[in-house]
A protein has these predicted regions:
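Alpha-helical transmembrane segments of multi-pass membrane proteins
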Residues: 1-464, 471-724
């Protein structure tokens, strides 16, 4: 009989713990798919990422804080789950067709105001009810906040593994979101056992099926009047193939990747570099080979090409849609294709190259910026032979170089000069940077002679057009602009060039974008780091003087939220810099933090007593962890270090959440306030770190700021401990 009672109790506890588990699963999976789709439609750089993540955290925090004003019932709890499951597909549909409301063309880049407005509206619809659900779950478990947080963390960890390793690699964003929603709808139905409401989950499932079927047709509507012939979501982005008459164009996250045929681009990316060393044998091409660059390289009879492409799906799409002649090029025995991150390939290869051609987009994101840093350029130089040439190209302007463009080009030029003694820039709508340890020339007569000797039949890199493009006046003008602009060096841990690229991006709009970026780029680090820290110290002094016990329990939660989200962003950027963009490992990094939260909250739940001294120890743990990371980062630590760091950071965060909330709830029964402040702290970190602090002040200075922030928080706790 006792066994039956124990079994019944265990089943009841499991059933009661499932709703917060579903909440964590729902929140993280929907957040991932919303972030991915938002990046497709709003220029997926760190600013986009920062806006949508910050808006998500903001509304989640507000939802949690205001939930106390909403009367709880189990019926409302169930309805809230179904509501969120329905709202996400509707938001994704609205996001896809937002271009019609914004009156923009397909693939056109939008400004900050539409981006900010859209992120706030979308997050309000999904994240606000999720914040309310956290408090509802606490009521459902009769005030057991720790069990809710524990199971929510476990649900998030499970969702991270399922979404990153099973849904994203095999399904589109819409299909993945629908599958995640369908799983939650079915589990919600069986968990709450509302047999009288069979029609509700059935209606939800039918809606999700219709949503899935509408995926590709809705994309065709989005791209009208262009003809969309294929769409494929991969772990690295959304690839879409458009056909206009005889031309095939590939778009990656709604940004133009390449078109075929496009002789101008393919010839320029190759010949200016190879004409400097026409006897080159070993050539490394990083990205962009399927667009025609490989065909141009093979015009040089001795070349053997190592072609590195991150996303294998690009090559598969090329085989499917490019003409047979281009498919034969990809199968040529002189070409070896490697599917991996270009930077990771360069770091690990033992081969030396006569030519390295970087054929990637400009450094508009931290991920791409890794290929334009001092450290990468030094590694490229190390892998080149004595007369080897390194080359890359970025969009520019033919006749007028604006101050914003000048700063961007100057940053790249001076960074390149840190590695190579000889640097030349080819003027034009696209600036081609050439660098070598051997003297270079851009004299028309020399290049023209080599074209004739090699019998090259080019259309754009030809004597007729080179005479105008390599006009000495234009060559000198671009050199003068590049050498006299801001001399900021783009480094792995201080990625300034992608901020300059964002400033340049802002000049495309007529709104406040340019003013905002110009303002922040002119600020000194004092206003970005020191001044906010001084304000925080004054706030702590005021709270200490007031002496309210709740302040000593709640302030560390907001600091923890800020610290952990900034630490996650720093770890991902640093990891990509050292080891390349390795999709599965990045996913595991994020999951390891969630696992740490689960373990930390479990540890907190098992504590026998709770007092302020325990918060002191945990806060001191944050300080030691940040100091350890900052010190170790300079030593190029092994991969496992980053996983352990995020696991430990999550563990401390989970433990602190339980202890501080336990102490706070003794003072006041407000289940959502602590969770809300945690999310609002994360909101501040997400908004500031990815878009401003990391590129402008760099990772080392930001880590120092985190250390100081947590130090003053520790002193605040010490003051509270002594006072009470």
């Amino acid at each position: 009989m006792q066994k039956l009672l124990d079994s019944h109790s265990w089943n009841l506890e499991l059933k009661n713990s499932l709703p917060p588990f579903l909440l964590g699963f729902l929140a993280l999976s929907f957040q991932i798919f919303l972030l991915r789709e938002f990046s497709v439609h709003f220029y997926g750089n760190e600013i986009t990422f920062g806006f949508i993540l910050a808006a998500w955290l903001l509304w989640g925090g507000i939802g949690s804080i205001t939930a106390s004003k909403i009367r709880f019932s189990q019926a409302r709890l169930i309805q809230a789950y179904y509501l969120v499951i329905i709202l996400l597909p509707l938001c994704l549909v609205g996001l896809r067709f937002s271009r019609f409301l914004l009156n923009i063309l397909p693939g056109e880049i939008t400004g900050i105001i539409p981006m900010l407005t859209s992120s706030l509206l979308l997050s309000l619809c999904v994240s606000f009810p999720l914040g309310v659900l956290f408090v509802f779950n606490t009521h459902f478990l009769k005030g057991n906040l720790y069990q809710v947080y524990l199971m929510e963390s476990l649900g998030s960890s499970t969702a991270g593994l399922l979404v990153y390793f099973f849904l994203i690699p095999f399904f589109s964003n819409w299909h993945g979101a629908a599958l995640a929603g369908g799983i939650i709808a079915l589990l919600s139905y069986f968990t709450f056992g509302e047999k009288r409401q069979k029609l509700v989950p059935l209606a939800v499932l039918i809606l999700l099926i219709v949503f899935c079927l509408f995926d590709f047709p809705s994309q065709k509507i989005y791209w009208k009047p262009f003809q969309l012939i294929q769409s494929k979501d991969t772990p690295y982005g959304k690839l879409q193939v458009l056909q206009t008459e005889e031309q095939i164009s590939l778009y990656n996250n709604n940004l133009h990747d390449f078109s075929y045929p496009n002789l101008a681009s393919s010839e320029e990316s190759v010949h200016f570099a190879l004409l400097k060393n026409p006897e080159a044998v070993n050539v490394l091409l990083i990205g962009g080979g399927a667009a025609g660059s490989l065909r141009q390289i093979l015009k040089y009879p001795r070349t053997q090409v190592d072609y590195v492409e991150l996303d294998p799906e690009i090559i598969r799409i090329s085989f499917r849609h490019l003409p047979e002649s281009e498919q034969e090029i990809l199968r040529n025995k002189r070409i070896y294709i490697f599917y991996r991150d270009g930077r990771a390939f360069l770091l690990k290869t033992q081969k030396s190259y006569d030519m390295i051609i970087l054929n990637l987009p400009e450094p508009a994101t931290a991920q791409v910026n890794r290929f334009y840093t001092k450290e990468f350029f030094l590694k490229a130089k190390e892998k080149l032979t004595e007369k080897g040439v390194f080359s890359f190209q970025v969009p520019s302007a033919e006749n007028y170089i604006s101050p914003e463009l000048q700063d961007f080009l100057s940053s790249l030029y001076h960074t390149l000069k840190q590695a190579f003694p000889f640097v030349k820039i080819v003027p034009g709508d696209t600036n081609i940077f050439l660098a070598s340890s051997h003297p270079l020339t851009l004299e028309f007569e020399t290049l023209n002679q080599k074209i004739e000797e090699l019998n090259l039949r080019n259309t754009y890199v030809s004597p007729q057009l080179l005479f105008s493009r390599l006009n000495p006046f234009r060559v000198e003008m671009i050199r003068e602009k590049a050498t006299t602009g801001k001399k900021a060096i783009n480094q792995d841990l201080s990625p300034i060039s992608y901020f300059y690229n964002s400033v340049l991006w802002s000049t495309q709009f007529k709104g406040i974008e340019k003013t905002v970026f110009a303002f922040f780029s002119s600020l000194r680090s004092f206003w970005l780091l020191d001044f906010p820290l001084i304000l925080f110290i004054f706030l702590l002094i005021i709270l200490w003087l007031k002496g309210k016990k709740s302040s000593f329990f709640l302030v560390p939660l907001a600091v923890m939220g800020f610290t952990t989200i900034v630490a996650e962003i720093i770890v991902i950027i640093a990891f990509q810099t050292l080891y390349g963009y390795l999709y599965q490992r990045i996913a595991l990094l994020l999951t390891s933090f969630m696992v740490g939260l689960f373990l930390g909250s479990y540890r907190g739940k098992k504590r026998k007593r709770f007092d302020l001294s325990q918060m002191l120890v945990i806060q001191a743990g944050f300080l030691l962890l940040i100091l350890l990371f900052q010190t170790t980062l300079k030593l190029n630590p092994p991969e496992i270090f980053f996983f352990i760091f995020l696991l430990a950071m999550g563990f401390l965060g989970g433990d602190l959440f339980v202890v501080s909330n336990h102490l706070f709830l003794k003072e006041k029964k407000n289940y959502g306030l602590g969770y809300g402040l945690d999310l609002l702290g994360s909101f501040g970190g997400a908004l500031a770190a990815s878009s401003l602090l990391i590129p402008l002040v760099g990772l080392p200075h930001l880590l120092t700021y985190l250390f100081l922030l947590n130090s003053f928080c520790l002193l605040f706790l010490v003051g509270g401990w002594r006072k009470n």
